[in-house]
Swiss-Prot record:
<feature type="region of interest" description="Disordered">
    <location>
        <begin position="388"/>
        <end position="465"/>
    </location>
</feature>
<feature type="binding site">
    <location>
        <begin position="237"/>
        <end position="244"/>
    </location>
    <ligand>
        <name>ATP</name>
    </ligand>
</feature>
<dbReference type="GO" id="GO:0008017">
    <property type="term" value="F:microtubule binding"/>
</dbReference>
<dbReference type="InterPro" id="IPR036961">
    <property type="entry name" value="Kinesin_motor_dom_sf"/>
</dbReference>
<feature type="domain" description="Kinesin motor">
    <location>
        <begin position="6"/>
        <end position="329"/>
    </location>
</feature>
<keyword id="KW-0493">Microtubule</keyword>
<dbReference type="Pfam" id="PF00225">
    <property type="entry name" value="Kinesin"/>
</dbReference>
<feature type="compositionally biased region" description="Polar residues">
    <location>
        <begin position="402"/>
        <end position="419"/>
    </location>
</feature>
<dbReference type="InterPro" id="IPR001752">
    <property type="entry name" value="Kinesin_motor_dom"/>
</dbReference>
<dbReference type="InterPro" id="IPR027640">
    <property type="entry name" value="Kinesin-like_fam"/>
</dbReference>
<comment type="function">
    <text>Kinesin is a microtubule-associated force-producing protein that may play a role in organelle transport. Its motor activity is directed toward the microtubule's plus end.</text>
</comment>
<keyword id="KW-0067">ATP-binding</keyword>
<feature type="region of interest" description="Disordered">
    <location>
        <begin position="886"/>
        <end position="931"/>
    </location>
</feature>
<dbReference type="GO" id="GO:0005524">
    <property type="term" value="F:ATP binding"/>
</dbReference>
<protein>
    <recommendedName>
        <fullName>Kinesin heavy chain</fullName>
    </recommendedName>
</protein>
<dbReference type="GO" id="GO:0007018">
    <property type="term" value="P:microtubule-based movement"/>
</dbReference>
<dbReference type="GO" id="GO:0003777">
    <property type="term" value="F:microtubule motor activity"/>
</dbReference>
Length: 931
């Protein structure tokens, strides 16, 4: 079941690209046949022979038909297969493997054509064979295995077990049932692959990609099963930094790529030189994964992609030499098959027969040995017949066949990480015992897991370190900005503080000024109250003085009435005199007119005229009296002024005595002053009495004179009566003069009477005051009591002043304390409001944190679901369609009644039918469906 075969090597040359043409590159490759090419470069010249050589004008279909179609048939027959694409960067490896577009019939590459060929072969196979197809997609980037279908798994470990061989632990495998599903997997994985632009390739692959297709087939009639695994490897190209211009991360990627390719070359050299006892598969994860493809259980095809230009002649020669070395590798491929029950029964019968033969042979040998040990000689004819060499060899071969571990099938284990691989045939290995090898593999797997874990931790630590450095740089920049802003704000704050201090100082000054104004206002208010009280007192005293003045005026009026009554010259008499004089003048005029006309005058009229003349005589007497009083009015006024001055002096002395505290030594002085004043007043009054007597004598003389004058006037009137015409006007004039004189005399008389009355009243008041002073000066006990009360009053006044000052000071302190209390309350309120705002902000932040944590958890779940499921836009989802549920495919070539291959449309139709019927979402296999 195993066969030794060499690696198939195919060379492909691409046309010159734009970079090579611009650099002056020329073709240096010539093709001598379908399998030979000749290179003529400056460094070396020579011919290279491979299984097939394709020139620059070859098509994708030609390469597939010659190189790959047979590999697909081998996979379906139960062999393992591998297809390599090797070459320098930009040589066309990805184009060869994937093509320009997987939906383009002409431009698509090897992998899409392999997929179509696999499903076409399944459809053309007998209907008794059931197939399951699984795919996985990974890349080796920076010596880390990354699952392209679950990109979050970026550091998967490589394990090796006795029954499973080498596999990648944790690699996602997806069951597919149609070409479109495989294409969707390829698209998703290709989008996640690491690429970058270099000077030689705008889309240079920065990793080795490995697309694995595992096909398991089972004959439903006989129960036999076979499995095949196909590795489709797109290697990253070797690079020269001088040509690619790689730098930074691209340069690090180039280093890792060249290192892994060097490890691949070392493995090929060790396999082909025939001298190496150790094959360095573990030097690189690429060679570790492809261990069975290089000298193991696999049929391998190597496609070397080369440039025909002289610009890359060194790289082309290196690639061709690599292909020549790889062509010398010998693989031992065998079918990965599981025996059917009938075959197992046949093997069991053979084993049972062999066991019977061995048991009889062992028993005969044991009997012979016992006889020999007993010292007996066994006859030669009784010796045990030895088994023939062919029989022994056949028995050993059968034993190896029977003890060969079978390839695990998906029927028994549908959740295996990678397909099982049977024992490798002839792969160089360490000379270890069976138990030691198992322990070594177990220990190696543990170490690989630890290495992967440590690498993941190191990668995460490096990532955190980069993020921390970026954050540190950002924080430094932010810190510098914040420092500058802080300095600016500090300057502004200092300015604001100065302004605040200035405003505070001004506020304090204004407050002090306001307090001073308040104090002044309070003092003025107090003074105003005192003035109001004084005004009230003055009003009261004014009322009292007004009452006294009214009383004085009343007394004055009474005395004036009495004095004027003695003269009997009231206003009514005076008016009557005027009336009589006027009537007399009129009567004289009328008599004169009668006498002029010659009429007779009656005697009665003369009598009446006589009476009126007598009255006129009295009026003339009064006029003379008034004239006399006018002559003495000046002396009266001078005397009145002297009396008023003396009265004012006495009142001033009296007020001084009242305002001054009288002591015992002042009483005699007061008495002397009062005696002097009283003596002076008596002298003045006696003088005034003498003057009044003289005035009375003068008045009597004047009265006599006036009487004489009246008599004279009466005589003149009589004479005038006899001659009225001559003296008529003279009388009228005299009457008018008398009238004026009368008025002036009456005014002077009234004024004199008023002065006399006022002097009498002042004299009475002075007497009363004098008597009061005498009474008060005689009471020494009252004076002592008054002095004691005054001293107490002064002490009480001082105490009251101190209390008022203390009260004002306490009021100020209370006001200050109230201000401080108000400010403290305002501060407490502001702090409480700030605390409430802070609590609200903290609650909002906690709420936002909870929401953010929930969103983060949902995002992680969504990422996990998207990476694990890889939902396709066409309605196919790896998760929803059951990517890890086996999808058996029945061959379609057995008859017309064979079921068709499940496709996306069929899956969608089944899902819709299940949804509408309300049945379980678990899809049933058509293997159990009866037509």
């Amino acid at each position: 079941m195993s066969s030794a075969n060499s690696i198939k090597v195919v060379a492909r040359f691409r046309p010159q690209n734009k970079v090579e043409l611009e650099s002056g590159g020329k073709p240096i490759v010539s093709f001598d046949g379908e399998d030979t090419c000749t290179v003529a470069s400056k460094e070396a010249q020579g011919s290279f022979t491979f299984d097939r050589v394709f020139d620059m004008g070859c098509k994708q279909q030609d390469i597939f038909d010659f190189s790959i179609r047979s590999t697909v048939d081998d996979i379906l027959n139960g062999y393992n297969g591998t297809v390599f694409a090797y070459g320098q960067t930009g040589a066309g490896k990805s184009y060869t493997m994937m093509g320009t577009n997987i939906d383009d019939d002409e431009g698509r590459g090897i992998i899409p054509r392999i997929v179509e060929q696999i499903f076409a072969s399944i459809m053309s196979s007998p209907g008794t064979i059931e197939y399951t197809v699984r795919v996985s997609y990974m890349e080796i980037y920076m010596e880390r295995i990354r699952d392209l279908l679950a990109p979050q798994n970026d550091n998967l470990p490589v394990h090796e077990e006795k029954n499973r061989g080498v596999y990648v632990k944790g690699l996602l495998e997806i069951y597919v049932s149609s070409v479109q599903e495989v294409y969707e997997v390829m698209r998703r994985g290709g989008n996640a692959r690491a690429v970058a632009a270099t000077n030689m390739n705008q889309e240079s692959s920065r990793s080795h990609s490995i697309f694995v297709i595992t096909i398991t087939q089972k004959n439903v009639e006989t129960g036999s099963a076979k499995s095949g695994q196909l590795f489709l490897v797109d290697l990253a190209g070797s690079e020269k930094v001088g040509k690619t211009g790689a730098s930074g991360q691209t340069l690090e990627e180039a280093k890792k790529i060249n290192k892994s390719l060097s490890a691949l070359g070392m493995v090929i050299n060790a396999l082909t030189d025939g001298k190496s006892s150790h094959i360095p598969y573990r030097d690189s994860k690429l060679t570790r994964i492809l261990q069975e493809s290089l000298g193991g259980n696999s049929r391998t095809t190597l496609i070397i992609n080369c440039s025909p230009s002289s610009y890359n002649d060194a790289e082309t020669l290196g690639t061709l030499r690599f292909g020549m070395r790889a062509k010398s590798i010998k693989n031992k491929a065998k079918v990965n098959a599981e025996l059917s029950p009938a075959e197992l029964k046949s093997l069991l019968k053979k084993a049972q027969g062999q066991v019977t033969n061995f048991e009889s042979y062992i028993s005969s040998l044991e009997g012979e040995i016992q006889m020999w040990r007993a010292g007996e000689a066994v006859p030669k004819e009784r010796w045990a017949t030895p088994l023939t060499t062919d029989a022994v060899a056949r028995t050993k071969a059968d034993a190896r066949t029977s003890t060969r571990p079978s390839t695990p099938s998906l029927i028994s284990d549908s959740r295996s990480e990678t397909p099982a691989i049977s024992d490798r045939a002839g792969t160089p290995s360490l000379p270890l015992d069976k138990d030691e090898r198992e322990e070594f593999l177990r220990r190696e797997n543990e170490l690989q897991d630890q290495i992967s874990e440590k690498e993941s931790q190191a990668a995460s630590a490096e990532k955190q370190l980069r993020e921390t450095k970026e954050e540190l740089a950002y924080l430094k920049d932010h810190d510098s900005k914040v420092g500058k802003e802080n300095e600016k704000l500090t300057t502004e704050v200092n300015e604001f503080k100065m302004q605040l201090e200035r405003l505070t100082f001004e506020s304090k000054e204004a407050q002090i000024t306001m307090d001073a104004l308040k104090e002044a206002n309070s003092e003025l208010t107090t003074e105003l109250d005192e003035v109001k009280q004084q005004l009230l007192d003055v009003k009261m005293s004014a009322k009292e003085s007004g009452a006294a003045l009214d009383e004085k005026e009343k007394r004055k009026a009474e005395k004036m009435a009495k004095m004027m009554a003695g003269f009997d010259l009231g206003g009514e008499v005076f008016s009557e005199n005027e009336r009589h004089i006027a009537e007399t003048i009129e009567k004289v005029d009328s008599l004169h007119e009668l006498s002029a006309t010659g009429d007779n005058i009656a005697p009665d009229e003369f009598k009446a005229l006589k009476a009126r003349l007598v009255e006129t005589q009295g009026i003339v007497r009064q006029a003379e009296l008034s004239m006399y009083s006018t002559s003495s009015s000046e002396s009266d006024s001078r005397r009145r002024q002297e009396l008023e001055a003396r009265l004012e002096a006495v009142q001033a002395e009296y007020e001084e005595i009242l305002t001054r505290n009288l002591g015992p030594e002042d009483i005699e002085e007061v008495k002397a002053r009062l005696e002097n004043a009283f003596a002076n007043r008596q002298t003045a009054q006696s003088q005034f009495v003498e003057e009044l007597k003289e005035d009375i004598a003068q008045k009597a003389a004047e009265n006599t004179r006036m009487k004489t004058l009246i008599e004279d006037l009466q005589q003149r009137v009589k004479a005038g009566a006899t001659a009225p015409m001559a003296n008529g006007k003279t009388i009228q004039q005299q009457i008018a003069e008398f009238d004026v004189m009368k008025k002036s005399l009456m005014r002077d008389l009234q004024n004199r009477c008023e002065r006399v009355v006022e002097l009498e009243i002042s004299l009475d008041e002075t007497r009363e005051q004098y008597n009061n002073v005498l009474r008060s000066s005689n009471n020494r006990a009252q004076q002592k009591k008054m002095a004691f009360l005054e001293r107490n009053l002064e002490q009480l006044t001082q105490v009251q002043r101190q209390l008022v000052e203390q009260n004002s000071a306490l009021k100020k302190e209370v006001a200050i304390a109230e201000r401080k209390l108000i400010a403290r309350n305002e501060r407490i309120q502001s702090l409480e409001s700030l605390l409430q705002d802070s609590q609200e902000k903290m609650a909002a932040a906690n709420h936002k944190y909870v929401q953010l944590a929930a969103v983060k958890e949902r995002l992680e779940l969504a990422k996990a679901g998207s990476t694990r499921g890889l939902n396709s836009p066409g309605g196919f989802s790896f998760a929803n369609a059951g990517s890890r549920i086996a999808k058996p495919l029945r061959g379609g070539g057995g008859g017309n009644d064979a079921p068709s291959i499940p496709t996306i449309q069929n899956l969608q139709g089944q899902n819709e039918g299940n949804t509408s019927s309300g049945s379980s979402s678990k899809r049933a296999s058509w293997f159990f469906t009866k037509s």
